[in-house]
Each structure stands twice: as structure tokens, then as C-alpha cells.
Amino acid sequence: MPIRGLLCYQGESNAQEIERVNEYGALSSLMVNDYRAKWKATQLPFFFVQLSSIDTLKYKGRLWPQFREEQRKMLQLISNSGMAVCSDIGFKNDVHPTNKKTVGERLARWALNKTYRKNIIPSGPLPSGAKYLNGKISIDFGYSGKGLKVSGGKILKGFSLDGQKEIPAQILQNKIIIAVMEKPVFIYYGWEPFTEANLVNSENLPASTFKIKVEQ
């Protein structure tokens, strides 16, 4: 049976224990390699959905930020892959968001861009690096489109130095600038099970949850 690519929306049950979170990327890579071997297509496209947002009151979602980060890392681990970010459409009390149309449209962007070579931005902002200089952290992004912006024109939310306490951040051209007293080890974004992080690109596609090292 010929197929053009693979779409995957899975992971809720894997995101409940840290051991399963940590092994998810490697297991996903093995799964994709197996599919590619069976179809004799070493670059068979693989596009997947990053978990949305969930509250921890009615669901065991404490590790969802770490799991979303492991999914982001899969973009480097698995060739010819793409990730649909959906942290902005989750429900606090429902592990399965009902807005599947938006999920499908975001997956379709990856297929249109990478498989069918359409001139379309496939993703929301993905971090490419963070640097510290003279009391400021500067974060660069891919897939910013015509520029970064705040969803709904509100105050920019979602950044922290420890994954817990939110800190102010501002958009400067296609970068995020954060004033700090000293260089931190990491910078976090959207590091909550149910996140209100609101950075998007010019296509109104949301930025991924991330934890990246701050270089100097």
C-alpha cells in the first residue's frame, strides 16, 4: 500500500512518568525508522502534534512541559519531520481538545511546505539559540515569518529563568530580549502544564514550549 507520509497525534499516556518522558524521543525515532524500513522510504515524512495544555487538578499533567520539550527535540532527532504546536488550544479539564480542525490545519502546513514544496510557513516560532550579553538575554527564532508578536496584542507571557517564576520579556524585531541581573543557565518558555504563553509569528502560529541553554 503506497503512502505519502505519516501523521501522529499521541503521547498523553507517555507524559505521566518521568522515565517514559525521557525515553519518548528515542522510541519515536525507532518507530519512524521501522515504518521507513517497511515502506522502503528512508525519508518518509513524519509530522506529529505536540501535546496541548492541561490542568493538573483533574489530570496527572505535571510533566507535560518536559514532555512537550522532548517532542520539540524530536525535530532534530528525526529527519524530515515537523511538529504542530497546539499548546494554545488545550482545555484545563479535558486531555483531548475538541478543536481538531486547527490541529489538522497545522499538520497540513508541514505537509504542504516540506512534502509538496509550497511557499508556506509550516510552524510557529522555534528557538534557535539564546545568548547573554551585558545584562540581557537575546533569543533567536526560526519560523518567525514577517515578525514575532503577542497573541491578541496582550502583554507577552510565558518566559522564566527557572521554569516557575515568570519574568518580563519584550519583542525586538525577530528576537526576544530579557533583562537579567546575571547569566542564567537556561531560559524557559511555556513551562506549565496549562500555559498562557502567547508568543506567535505573523501567521498567528504559537511558539513551542522550550528549555534551552543560555550561551555567552
What kind of region is each of these model predictions?
Residues 1-216:
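Cell-envelope and extracellular/periplasmic
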